Amino acid sequence: MIFFRVHFINFFLILWFSSSYVFPYGDSLRIKIESIVNGASGKVGVSILGFEPYDTLTINGSGKFPMQSVFKFPLALAILNQVDKGRFSLEQKIHLNKDNLLPETWSPLREKYPDGGVDITLDELLTATVSQSDNNGCDILFRLIGGTKKVEQYIHSLGIKDIAIVATEAEMHIDWQIQYHNWSSPTAMNQLLYKFFYGKILSQKSRDYLNQVMVKTTTSPDRLKGLLPKGTIVAHKTGSSGENENGLAAATNDIGIVTLPDGKRFIISVFVSDSMADEKTRNKISAEIVKAVWDNYNMSHFNNYK
């Protein structure tokens, strides 16, 4: 029965994601999004999955985009899979010391525990890694689970192949080019988001836990959430490369699940890569795309009740 369910979900996703876009007002929405993408001064990948079968729209959906910290979402899935199996517990203690609280990287945990020498729960570690995108927390989790390969193997075991996870945060800081080895296609990331929320790859308890952790994300609020009404529920994970010495930004990403006023949801992944635009412009790409989808759905809902 489990074998049948997994393969039914995979078959359903193949049909869903290989379909042409059939959004309400699909032509106008695609035109709108393409006009937004044109201002990126770089490569943009977009995948949108609505709440009705065949409600899809993709732009560069099969392209390879560096994930940066978006890869902390599949890492969290892999950790929680092990929690569900009883190997880990959210209450178990993880020791922090100065050796695993590296300097010169984004780490709210290091700011909170500058001298190390403390034990924190896996819950606190995972929350900091996802909600606050803590880089040290990320690499501690990779060591806990057995390395990047273990996470990649788990994601591939779900039937999602177009995601590569080969380098830790510390390794990405060694050389600018290394970040490109951690990549995903927008379509694959949407497939993973779908399986997370609807595909029962985690227990209900673990799914709800991670969903709430992602809702509490504090990084880059001006991307997916930037133009949505205050209080809109968005479970998301950002990824950012910063800019190199030439002003090139390898990754300005945000992926997540947006809840509409009527309680329905749509899934969206936006990757902005190799852009020469400034940070405000790059962030606005995601904000304007998700707002266009939001307005499209709300207009459709309004017209259905005229």
Question: How should these model regions be labeled?
Answer:
Residues 54, 66-96, 268:
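Active-site SXXK
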Residues 22-63, 242:
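Beta-lactamase-like hydrolase cores
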Residues 101-139:
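Conserved catalytic neighborhood of penicillin-recognizing serine enzymes
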